[in-house]
């Protein structure tokens, strides 16, 4: 009876040991599955973050290129505006010069008219007809707008 009890006890221990081993293997397998699932979940997040970062880098590069092109275009526009401003200033200078010349021409014209009238008045009072024609033609050739 004692030997049968010892055998039965060893049998029970072996059975429990076997069940523990099965449970340990199941626990290890479940732990591995959980770990793999967590790694996969984290990898998806990391992969998404990596893709987002690549996209952000590409967009930042495009934005930088756009800003650089905009700065170049703005600089060109500023140069054109400066050139236009200089051209307008030059036109204003030419206009002032033309007005000055026009005023001088009016003064010269008035002076020539007065000189012509004075010479004509002197000639009519002296009565020289031939010299009058000569002075008239000389005045007319000197001042074509007076005739």
Curated annotation (Swiss-Prot):
Region of interest (Disordered), ranges: 1-25, 125-147
GO CC annotation: BLOC-1 complex; neuromuscular junction; presynapse
Range of residues in the leader sequence: none
Source species, domain of life: Eukaryota
GO BP: autophagosome-lysosome fusion; endosomal transport; eye pigment granule organization; neuromuscular synaptic transmission; olfactory learning; regulation of synaptic vesicle cycle; synapse organization; synaptic vesicle recycling via endosome
Phenotypic effect of disruption: Show reduced eye pigmentation.
Pfam families xrefs: GCN5L1
Function: Component of the biogenesis of lysosome-related organelles complex-1 (BLOC-1) involved in pigment granule biogenesis and membrane trafficking in synapses. In response to high synaptic activity at neuromuscular junctions, stabilizes Pldn protein levels and, together with Pldn, plays a role in promoting efficient synaptic vesicle recycling and re-formation through early endosomes.
SUBUNIT field: Component of the biogenesis of lysosome-related organelles complex-1 (BLOC-1) composed of Blos1, Blos2, Blos3, Blos4, Dysb, Muted, Pldn and Snapin. Interacts with Pldn.
Family: Belongs to the BLOC1S1 family.
Name of the protein this chain belongs to: Biogenesis of lysosome-related organelles complex 1 subunit 1
Organism: Drosophila melanogaster (Fruit fly)
Gene encoding the protein: Blos1
């Amino acid at each position: 009876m004692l030997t049968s009890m010892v055998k039965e006890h060893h049998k029970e221990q072996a059975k429990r040991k076997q069940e523990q081993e099965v449970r340990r293997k199941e626990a290890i397998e479940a732990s591995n599955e959980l770990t793999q699932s967590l790694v996969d979940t984290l990898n998806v997040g990391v992969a998404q973050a990596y893709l987002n970062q690549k996209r952000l880098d590409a967009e930042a590069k495009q934005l930088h290129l756009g800003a650089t092109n905009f700065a170049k275009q703005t600089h060109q526009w500023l140069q054109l505006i400066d050139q236009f401003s200089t051209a307008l200033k030059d036109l204003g200078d030419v206009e002032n010069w033309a007005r000055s010349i026009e005023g001088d021409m009016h003064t010269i014209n008035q002076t020539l008219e007065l000189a012509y009238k004075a010479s004509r008045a002197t000639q009519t009072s002296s009565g020289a007809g031939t010299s009058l024609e000569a002075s008239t033609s000389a005045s007319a050739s000197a001042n074509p707008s007076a005739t």
